[in-house]
Amino acid sequence: MSFLGLRFKEVIVSSSGHATTQQEQESSARPRRSKSKFGCRECKARRVKCDEAYPTCKRCQRQGIVCSSAPRLTQWQIETPWLSLQPKTFVNRRLLQYWLEKVSQTLVIDPENNPFSFPALEYIAQSSALLHAIQSVSASHEQYFSANTPIIALEERGKAIACLRKEINQSQHAPNALILTIMLLALAQCADSDTKDYGKQHLFATRAMIHSMLQNTSMLATNGPAIQLCLGMYLYWDMCSSFLVDPCESQGLNSLNISNAVHRMGDWHHPMYGTCSGLLLIMANVGRYCRQILDSPQNRNFVQEAVLEAQLTTWKTSPANPRLGHLYEAFRNHGLIFLYRAGAHAQSSCLMDPDSSEAQESLIQQYAEETVRHLMQIPATSHYLNFQSLPLLTVGSELTESNQSLRDQVRDRLRAIYSLNRLPANLLALRLLEELWDARDRGNPSFWLPHMLQKDWRLLLG
């Protein structure tokens, strides 16, 4: 990989040869009230001082409102000799900088190990599609993915799609650049105002590319880390969308091929999520199964449920740190609660053993409360927040009226996640939870997945 030269702008201090007067000296000696540069929009609108905490200031947190924090960007200059390679491609330096320093950080758990930031410049030099996709997402992110998508974001998205069609047929383009481009197009699309659109066609396109990669034994043998990066990106995306895909449509990859590929990855540390590749595959299979029995309760398979439950409970890894361990336990419990609740929903029209049902409800409550506590062990300033919204929805929906304190923590955390990554799906998930809590408190508890589907929503969370 070639190294690009980075240099920060020199701070220019102007000086004057004129002597200062006593009045000027006294004026300069008086303390000056510094003006906030990073105060959130809410505090500025109220003309009050903001403590500039990120992603949520204390005032917004106390009032229980969304905090629209200003991004922390540094001035930088980058020597980019590769720009001359693509004279027909317009590079918006501001949007590119915004991606490198801000937006790309929402895709990883550790900003110091981020292949989607400065290391991606190598691929941007080769892929106009990736550059336009990045500029489109950056333009939308600046405006909190507003329902009125900025014109520049739409223009850049259109250019990205046009370039991508050409690049897919050209073998010299790196697979991770293509898959990142498609993933960003899906992100931009699902952040639009259409709550039914989760970027399905982009998911299926990526699935076809991964299938082709897994069939290519020479590629698997020679491009280890690059292939693992691509596979991990797909695994996480597939897990988040597995229950959104209609069961009658195209399903996952060949189970043997994908299982073997994940087994080969082992505990390889993926920059998006760490060492939980195997858990993501299990959770994706849980999501697909839950959607299947939701649509066709008569096809409930107790053997398959037992296998999935055993896979979830026995999965293990060695997380890099305790906070990552808390995130993995939240993922595991999300999968177990999802599986138990879907099974109970499928059998709700049948006679059930009251003792068995009561025991399972107690277990679900235990997992829900335990999971919230796991997630709250992760500070609100951590990049791990970007991967919490899906388990928060699952476990939050199970909290009872007696768990008001935990409900408040879930509310605060979803608002903080929105302030961090600005994806509207986080606020829609909170809205969904408020409806579910209201129904539960009135004696009508409901499973969150059918409730969401009845609203004709397909929220891509995580």
Region annotations inferred by a language model:
Residues 51-55:
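Short linker/helix segments within small regulatory modules
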Residues 99, 117-123, 132-146, 156-196, ...:
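Hydrophobic/aromatic-rich effector regions of fungal transcription factors
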Residues 124-129, 172-176, 221-230, 270, ...:
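Structural motif
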